[in-house]
């Protein structure tokens, strides 16, 4: 990125133990004009600090909670304020973060699913319609080079006429009980309350 011509964004979650956080940071880098300037990256200030040190982020823009981060951004004006916050956390956190972001007037880029249940989804839709704060869900799959190649092959007719297709997302790594072996990525996925 040349000079300081970039759009400032914040990140909530996505710290050291986050699988999707790395994917989001890589995608942000590829865009070229976005820069993470602060956020709340872990369950403690120390975990967040350990994470941001190698990234060269300003410790003043590190917050112990997403609420503190979003409320601080609400008070900032113009170029000091982030353009949006990217939230990469377990599913049960999507709703409270989105609601807080909208209360603070901060656009949010979230992950799937929007919420954990239909009531939360309805509340979220009402909140967004009332506040008009943009809320978007990340769809990173179109950025994969494999999909671009598949699209090219289809367009060129290289594989003939498509009559039917089936797509699935496998999580083979969860076929074994990896949550019993300390895998934090698996813990929240197998807990019905989370």
In which residue ranges do the predicted regions lie?
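N-terminal Rossmann-like dinucleotide-binding module
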Residues: 1-57, 185
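Beta-loop-alpha module in the N-terminal Rossmann-like domain of NAD(P)-dependent dehydrogenases
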Residues: 61-127
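Rossmann-fold dehydrogenase core element
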Residues: 123-141, 163-164
